[in-house]
Regions:
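LysM (lysin motif) carbohydrate-binding repeats in extracellular/periplasmic proteins that recognize
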Residues: 115-118, 159
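Active-site His/Glu-centered metal-binding helix of metallohydrolases
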Residues: 139
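Major-groove DNA-recognition helix of helix-turn-helix-type DNA-binding domains
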Residues: 129, 133
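Basic nucleic-acid-binding alpha-helical/helix-turn surface characteristic of O6-alkylguanine DNA
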Residues: 1-115, 165
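…primarily DNA-binding HTH/wHTH and HhH modules…
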Residues: 142-165
Length: 165
């Protein structure tokens, strides 16, 4: 059975849960999204045991620095995601979106060379296992609307306002 180190910490937008395996962050989400967390972890590992840990990989410190507007704080965290090649491509491109900017799902699809795959890009965004650090909140509807965010649109709005330079 796979042992996963889990930590919970307060943030300005609610309690955040971090999950670490093999000295890499594999999941970051909000505590009130526990069902999503369990679904994604079960899909990935089938059987696992959550072991409480205190600030693994200094995630708390890095998130605290981010909330204090240190935009480079996540550079220190090693990530480990799984997903299809397409999802991995989308998630890698999300990490290239500069802090304080947004792009549309259509722009993101074009950027990865799949301009007709807007819906697939949105689905990959929805399956992002590492909220905030892989900044799916920076992707908005073509109209400029803050469409969809697994953690809630109110958090997406807060994060985007927080990141304004």
């Amino acid at each position: 059975m796979k042992e996963l180190m889990v930590d919970e910490f307060d943030s300005p937008i609610g309690i955040i849960v971090g999950v670490v395996s093999k000295n890499r962050l594999i999941h970051l989400d909000f505590a009130d999204c526990q069902e999503r967390l369990l679904r994604l972890l079960t899909h990935r590992y089938k059987k696992f045991k959550q072991v409480p840990a205190k600030n693994p990989l200094n995630i708390r410190d890095c998130l605290s620095a981010y909330f204090d507007k240190d935009w480079k704080s996540f550079d220190k965290i090693k990530l480990l995601t799984d997903g299809t090649l397409f999802q991995q491509t989308v998630w890698a491109e999300l990490q290239r979106i500069p802090c304080g900017t947004t792009i549309s799902y259509a722009q993101l699809a074009s950027t990865i060379g799949k301009p007709k795959a807007v819906r697939a890009v949105a689905n990959a965004n929805a399956r992002n296992p590492i909220a905030i650090i892989i900044p799916c909140h920076r992707v908005i509807a073509k109209s400029g609307a803050l469409a969809g965010y697994a953690g809630g649109v109110h958090r997406k709005e807060w994060l985007l306002q927080h990141e304004q330079l």
